């Protein structure tokens, strides 16, 4: 079997998710080829293989015990700690503002529809890729503002995460930030430019914002203490997609389906709640991620409702209102 046929064969097996732990060396070689991996030495390659093998065993175990499916993907030669350190970015700033009002949602949830999704109303912008920059906080907050703009003006726009990275002096750019502090920083800055005017660079740079080009301005921001998780069903249609904090460790190798087991060992990633529904009698939440469309369900993922999946209720949800 020549090399091309070999890779096609292994790729077909990988896509089927019917993994055999004894074939880990074959899967690893296909992974290296598919994702153009280059290691500094054979010692480093061996180290990466051992991490890959550990991740493969976890994927196999999850595929046997969860309703979701998991796969070898672009993160599979990284340890969980490495992935969290490089591709998330939720962290506590050294200082905070106090602009956002805190609202206690302790009323029982209403009886809304069984499913709702802002994507079906064309109010969610395309999935982005933060790359190796810990700016998930900027993507999640601006994703919510993009949706609010679409709800208000019936137009999809892309706002500048790079402006947030460079010009939000409360949060720490690619070194991390929080959701409500990002909204507070936008209020202080006066607005946000389009991505086309201030393109993404995935790195910390000097602030170059131009207030004459601000397209979206934030009027108020809110933080919600959610006593009943189902209360999000009432909130989501009212305020638009909601930025939320999670522990991303258990979703790294996610492919598709509803995640039933996602534990919380500490919040580290910001994502955007865009919808909810029911599949095979399992109620779920749908989140937009920032790891590109080649991850998960075209960049989105689903978790089971009412289990505090990935610690989604452990931090206050944040929203803002635009002018």
From Swiss-Prot:
CDD domains: Peptidase_C1A (cd02248)
Propeptide: 17-112
Catalysed reactions, semicolon-separated: Endopeptidase of broad specificity, hydrolyzing substrates of both cathepsin L and cathepsin B
Enzymatic class: hydrolase
Coiled coil: none
Signal peptide (UniProt feature, chain positions): 1-16
PTM text: Synthesized as an inactive proenzyme and activated by proteolytic removal of the inhibitory propeptide.
InterPro entries from the UniProt entry: Papain-like_cys_pep_sf, Pept_asp_AS, Pept_cys_AS, Pept_his_AS, Peptidase_C1A, Peptidase_C1A_C, Peptidase_C1A_papain-like, Prot_inhib_I29
Misc note: Optimal pH is 4.0, also active at neutral pHs.
Regions that span the bilayer: none
Higher taxonomy: Viruses, Viruses incertae sedis, Naldaviricetes, Lefavirales, Baculoviridae
Keyword field: Disulfide bond, Glycoprotein, Hydrolase, Protease, Signal, Thiol protease, Zymogen
Designated name of the protein: Viral cathepsin
Enzyme Commission code(s) on record: 3.4.22.50
Family to which the UniProt record says this protein belongs: Belongs to the peptidase C1 family.
Keyword Hydrolase: yes
Active site: 136, 269, 289
Single GO term (MF): cysteine-type peptidase activity
A Pfam match: Peptidase_C1
Paired cysteines (S-S): 133-174, 167-207, 262-310
Organism from which the protein derives: Bombyx mori nuclear polyhedrosis virus
